């Protein structure tokens, strides 16, 4: 499944990873491309 950035961010928040946004979110966005 291809995630859009907002959807990916929402998914990470739902998974409780929002606290890692400084590290995980940019990496996840890069991996999702």
UniProtKB/Swiss-Prot annotation:
Superkingdom of the organism of origin: Eukaryota
Which UniProt keywords are listed?
A: Antimicrobial, Bacteriolytic enzyme, Glycosidase, Hydrolase
Which cysteines are disulphide-bonded? none
Point out the signal peptide segment: none
Q: Give the enzyme's EC designation.
A: 3.2.1.17
Q: Which GO terms describe its biological process?
A: defense response to bacterium; killing of cells of another organism
Q: Which reaction does it catalyse?
A: Hydrolysis of (1->4)-beta-linkages between N-acetylmuramic acid and N-acetyl-D-glucosamine residues in a peptidoglycan and between N-acetyl-D-glucosamine residues in chitodextrins
Molecular-function GO terms, alphabetical: lysozyme activity
Record's subunit section: Monomer.
Further comment found in the protein's record: Lysozyme C is capable of both hydrolysis and transglycosylation; it also shows a slight esterase activity. It acts rapidly on both peptide-substituted and unsubstituted peptidoglycan, and slowly on chitin oligosaccharides.
What's the stated role of this polypeptide? Lysozymes have primarily a bacteriolytic function; those in tissues and body fluids are associated with the monocyte-macrophage system and enhance the activity of immunoagents.
Question: Per the similarity annotation, which family is this?
Answer: Belongs to the glycosyl hydrolase 22 family.
This chain's protein is named: Lysozyme C, spleen isozyme
Name the source organism: Equus caballus (Horse)
